[in-house]
A protein has these predicted regions:
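N-terminal nucleotide-binding beta1-loop-alpha1 segment
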Residues: 1-24
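Conserved active-site beta-strand element of glycosyltransferases/polysaccharide synthases
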Residues: 224-227, 236
Length: 251
């Protein structure tokens, strides 16, 4: 069984108007029934057998009531790469799963089954990119609007959590710096991908294996795109409609 530490990403670049209108100082503290959104996430992580440690990153003042509820708190630097460096320096277990602060639908059962499936799917991988099929998501959650990539064989969405082995941190930091430096230039971003992939993606004939190859060629370590039959992993709370949607399910 994988031994995993959960990295709960609690940063927030700005407080959006719809969150202010809910009377919350942060997305994590949005009320869903009798609990805050972060409570659902922490409860699920705590009850997942493979997760042995929970690390929370964010603003200390926002999370003052939660610092004692996690194993380690890391102050947010407001820079993705710098945060990743700090997290890597504190990593203890063989695997880390990165979890955003806005995925309250993922239950401990889903986490457990997902990690077990990843272990069976590729026991020696360094990176597991979870992928949801549009058909699965819309069958279970009709009406929810997600962004999908059109690939050969269907429409797919990258899941909101991803799993890595501890040894991948240096490569993740290196590649994260490249992405950060290129983020405002379409030309620079395009240069990160081989021409064959750009061509296939434009024609919607790229496959999941093609996507894997691009990533593996960059990190020089084994990684897989893992098709997951759990639509909850695809649903995050990015807008008021999403909040209303998860409230209907959880309350």
């Amino acid at each position: 069984m994988f031994e995993i530490e959960a990295i709960l990403l609690g940063g927030q670049d700005k407080l959006e108007d719809w969150i202010k209108q809910e009377g919350a100082p942060h997305k994590a503290l949005l009320q869903i029934g009798e609990k805050k959104m972060i409570d659902y996430i922490l409860e699920s992580l705590r009850n997942t057998p493979q997760i042995k440690r929970i690390v929370l990153t964010g603003d200390r003042e926002i999370y003052k009531d939660y610092i004692e509820k996690v194993d380690l708190f890391i102050d947010d630097t407001h820079n993705f790469v710098d945060n990743l460096i700090k997290i890597s320096e504190k990593a203890e277990l063989p695997y880390s799963v990165f979890v955003p602060i806005d995925v309250p639908l993922i239950t401990s059962e889903i986490y457990e089954k997902t990690f077990s499936y990843c272990e069976e799917f590729c026991p020696d991988c360094y990176l597991y990119v979870l992928v949801n099929n549009k058909k699965d998501v819309e069958e279970k959650f009709p009406g929810t609007k997600r962004t999908y990539w059109r690939l050969k064989g269907g429409y797919y969405k990258m899941g909101n959590i991803f799993l890595i082995r501890k040894e991948l941190y240096p490569k993740a930091i290196e590649y994260g710096k490249i992405l950060f430096e290129s983020r405002k230039s379409a030309t620079k971003l395009a240069s990160l991908f081989p021409l064959w992939f750009i061509f296939k993606a434009a024609l919607h004939i790229a496959t999941l294996r093609d996507c894997e190859k691009v990533v593996v060629d960059k990190i020089k370590l084994n990684g897989r795109a893992v098709p997951i039959p759990y639509p909850e992993i695809a649903v995050d709370v990015d807008k008021k409609d999403d909040l209303d949607f998860v409230r209907k399910i959880l309350t």
